[in-house]
Amino acid sequence: MQEKKEEDLQQVLNNVSEVGIDEVGRGSIFGPVFSAVVELTEKNKFTLKKLGVTDSKKLTPKKRKLLLPKILLLSSDYGIGQSSAREIDKLGIRVATELSMIRALKKLKKKPSELLVDGPLLLRPWKGTQKNIESGDSKFISIASASIVAKVSRDNLMVRLERKYSGYLIFKNKGYGTREHLSLIKKNGITKLHRKSFLKKSNLI
């Protein structure tokens, strides 16, 4: 009888899934905004929590890189999407972020029955059930995992883009508007991957 209960519990832990989505790069002034969605069973949520998965902003770059392959291995499914700087300038950051999320969701094998979205805003194009959770990346392992996948994926792209767009220390600032980055824009001008709509607000172009 006890063995049967344990088998039933294991079945629940293996079958019940949580799907979380998060974005990174929303406030950057260079390059795309990235989104990632991750599906996890209850069992694998516990495993990742023990390994130290939490909000990507609370982890060192080294820790995020170490956790990424573990998340991908233990996820039932995942997807990554992005929207370019041009799309951000054309559509606005909220719509472009939503577009990157939808692109990530389209890479899943099946539509989730419920989606956990980090932050207070609805994912307006999504027709399924969703829950918005402020600071969700600190509360739900699926969202935290998505934040790590998105962050490492985008950071890796920034390092690669440094080879083509040198002179802005993109590998270091990851496209964010640090004082050093803004100073280099004044010195070298802007590239086609800089978000013009963001820079106009700062009177940099």
UniProtKB/Swiss-Prot annotation:
Chief localisation class: cytoplasm
GO molecular function: manganese ion binding; RNA binding; RNA-DNA hybrid ribonuclease activity
Keyword Protease among record annotations: no
First-tier enzyme category under EC: hydrolase
A GO cellular-component term linked to this record: cytoplasm
InterPro entries registered for this protein in UniProt: RNase_HII, RNase_HII/HIII, RNase_HII/HIII_dom, RNaseH-like_sf, RNaseH_sf
RNase H type-2 domain span: 16-205
Keywords linked to the UniProt accession: Cytoplasm, Endonuclease, Hydrolase, Manganese, Metal-binding, Nuclease
Cofactor note: Manganese or magnesium. Binds 1 divalent metal ion per monomer in the absence of substrate. May bind a second metal ion after substrate binding.
Highest rank taxon of the organism: Bacteria
Residues at which a divalent metal cation binds: D22, E23, D118
UniProt key word Metal-binding: yes
Annotated localization: Cytoplasm
Cofactor(s) of this protein: Mn(2+); Mg(2+)
Record-linked SUPFAM superfamilies: Ribonuclease H-like
EC number, UniProt record: 3.1.26.4
GO BP terms in the entry: DNA replication, removal of RNA primer; mismatch repair
Reaction catalysis annotation: Endonucleolytic cleavage to 5'-phosphomonoester
Matching NCBIfam families: PRK00015.1-3, PRK13925.1
Family: Belongs to the RNase HII family.
Functional description taken from the UniProt entry: Endonuclease that specifically degrades the RNA of RNA-DNA hybrids.
Name under which the protein is recorded: Ribonuclease HII
Organism (species): Prochlorococcus marinus (strain MIT 9301)
Taxonomic placement: Bacteria, Bacillati, Cyanobacteriota, Cyanophyceae, Synechococcales
This protein's encoding gene: rnhB
